[in-house]
């Protein structure tokens, strides 16, 4: 039996679905969704924790046995992201950080130059860095070379629900990566999550697709099943695509 655990740096997780917390209507709805998802690792925007105290969310994650993964959401440059990561380390007593360095508010796309700069500084400072990046195989390689513990390419821009708009690039990132690849951003529904795993990703990170769904808990359960199905399909090996039909049973 193939080991189904997700291993990043020195930690292993039974679930390959990483959840975000943004967009949830309230903590009760979020709790139901987190339980249904089976996630063991959930992102927390450190700015929101600072601004709102964050005790309710952090207490919820602690009660559910879910590891919080602080992120630098909203940061617009390397210096700001590094400072936010350092604050997160002090506040949550963890050296894990989901690194986000955004170029602008309209697209929410990563700023490649500032992202690599921040990643290098944080790795040197002892962080386990998980960077949110563009679907660019070259940039993914640069981030891995900088010492990142995983690379997290987007499927499409944050919150768009467009799914994976450039699957070939995701496949190229997977083929060239020596660290786990986590599809991050753009997931709209369960089939998108399954496709990410079929393309070879090691995990999927999503938030909006669940927190803003009509029934967040039901969608979380669907996403969990989709990630598992996609992972198993990838391991099983799909049949090759053919131009012409081929009978499944030999002719008499």
From Swiss-Prot:
Under Enzyme Commission nomenclature, its number is 2.8.1.10
Task: Write the protein's name.
Answer: Thiazole synthase
What is the phylogenetic placement of the source species in the record? Bacteria, Bacillati, Actinomycetota, Actinomycetes, Mycobacteriales
Species of origin: Mycobacterium avium (strain 104)
Q: Which keywords fit this entry according to its UniProt record? A: Cytoplasm, Schiff base, Thiamine biosynthesis, Transferase
InterPro entries tied to this protein: Aldolase_TIM, Thiazole_synthase_ThiG, ThiG
What GO terms in the biological process aspect are recorded for it?
thiamine diphosphate biosynthetic process
The listed locations are:
Cytoplasm
Q: What is its main location?
A: cytoplasm
The answer to whether keyword Nucleotidyltransferase applies is no
GO CC entries: cytoplasm
Q: Catalytic activity, per the record?
A: [ThiS sulfur-carrier protein]-C-terminal-Gly-aminoethanethioate + 2-iminoacetate + 1-deoxy-D-xylulose 5-phosphate = [ThiS sulfur-carrier protein]-C-terminal Gly-Gly + 2-[(2R,5Z)-2-carboxy-4-methylthiazol-5(2H)-ylidene]ethyl phosphate + 2 H2O + H(+)
Provide the function of this protein: Catalyzes the rearrangement of 1-deoxy-D-xylulose 5-phosphate (DXP) to produce the thiazole phosphate moiety of thiamine. Sulfur is provided by the thiocarboxylate moiety of the carrier protein ThiS. In vitro, sulfur can be provided by H(2)S.
Q: Which domain of life is it from?
A: Bacteria
Q: Give the family this protein belongs to, as stated in its UniProt record.
A: Belongs to the ThiG family.
Subunit details for this protein? Answer: Homotetramer. Forms heterodimers with either ThiH or ThiS.
Catalytic machinery residues: 98
GO MF, one example: thiazole synthase activity
Pathway named in the protein's UniProt entry: Cofactor biosynthesis; thiamine diphosphate biosynthesis
Residues at which 1-deoxy-D-xylulose 5-phosphate binds? 159, 185-186, 207-208
PANTHER family recorded: THIAZOLE SYNTHASE
Class in the EC hierarchy, top level: transferase
């Amino acid at each position: 039996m193939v080991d189904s655990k997700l291993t990043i740096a020195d930690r292993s997780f039974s679930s390959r679905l990483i959840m975000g917390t943004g967009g949830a209507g309230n903590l009760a709805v979020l709790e139901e969704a987190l339980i249904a998802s089976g996630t063991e690792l959930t992102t927390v925007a450190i700015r929101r924790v600072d601004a709102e105290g964050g005790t309710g969310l952090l207490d919820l994650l602690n009660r559910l046995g879910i590891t919080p993964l602080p992120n630098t959401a909203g940061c617009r440059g390397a210096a700001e992201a590094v400072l936010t990561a350092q604050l997160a380390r002090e506040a949550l007593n963890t050296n894990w950080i989901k690194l986000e360095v955004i170029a602008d508010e309209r697209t929410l796309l990563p700023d490649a130059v500032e992202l690599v700069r921040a990643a290098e500084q944080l790795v040197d400072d002892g962080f386990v860095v998980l960077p949110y990046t563009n679907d660019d195989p070259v940039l993914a390689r640069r981030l891995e070379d900088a010492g990142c513990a995983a690379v997290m390419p987007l499927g499409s821009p944050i919150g768009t629900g467009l799914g994976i708009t450039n699957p070939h690039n995701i496949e190229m990132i997977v083929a060239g990566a020596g660290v786990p690849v986590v599809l991050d951003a753009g997931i709209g529904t369960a089939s998108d999550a399954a496709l990410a795993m079929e393309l070879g990703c090691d995990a999927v990170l999503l938030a909006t697709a669940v927190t803003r769904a009509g029934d967040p808990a039901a969608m979380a359960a669907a996403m969990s099943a989709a990630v598992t199905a996609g992972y198993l399909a990838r391991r099983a090996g799909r049949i090759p695509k053919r131009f012409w039909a081929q009978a499944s049973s030999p002719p008499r």
